[in-house]
Amino acid sequence: MAKRDQLTGKGPLSGNTRSHAMNHSKRRWNVNLQKATIKTENGSQRVLVSAKTLKTLKKHNLLA
């Protein structure tokens, strides 16, 4: 399963981790994915969304 928000498409970012000696190694910053049940025309559907999207859904009262 892809580490991607199913509603907004937000995915992981990549970059380098740096030590004090300025050594670097590649790493990924993954999205904080949460399971949520949202309201749809046909009832409700379970989706994987980021924590920020979940806050927005709660703000607009779109959770089932």
From Swiss-Prot:
Pfam families xrefs: Ribosomal_L28
Region named Disordered: 1-27
Entry's Gene Ontology cellular component terms: ribonucleoprotein complex; ribosome
GO MF terms, alphabetically ordered: structural constituent of ribosome
One GO BP annotation of this record: translation
Highest taxon of source: Bacteria
UniProt keyword terms in alphabetical order: Ribonucleoprotein, Ribosomal protein
InterPro entries per UniProt: Bacterial_rp_bL28 (IPR050096), Ribosomal_bL28 (IPR026569), Ribosomal_bL28/bL31-like_sf (IPR034704), Ribosomal_bL28_bact-type (IPR001383), Ribosomal_bL28_sf (IPR037147)
Gene3D superfamilies xref list: Ribosomal protein L28/L24
Family under the similarity heading: Belongs to the bacterial ribosomal protein bL28 family.
HAMAP family documented for this protein: Ribosomal_bL28
NCBIfam families: L28
Name under which the protein is recorded: Large ribosomal subunit protein bL28
Gene transcribed to yield this protein: rpmB
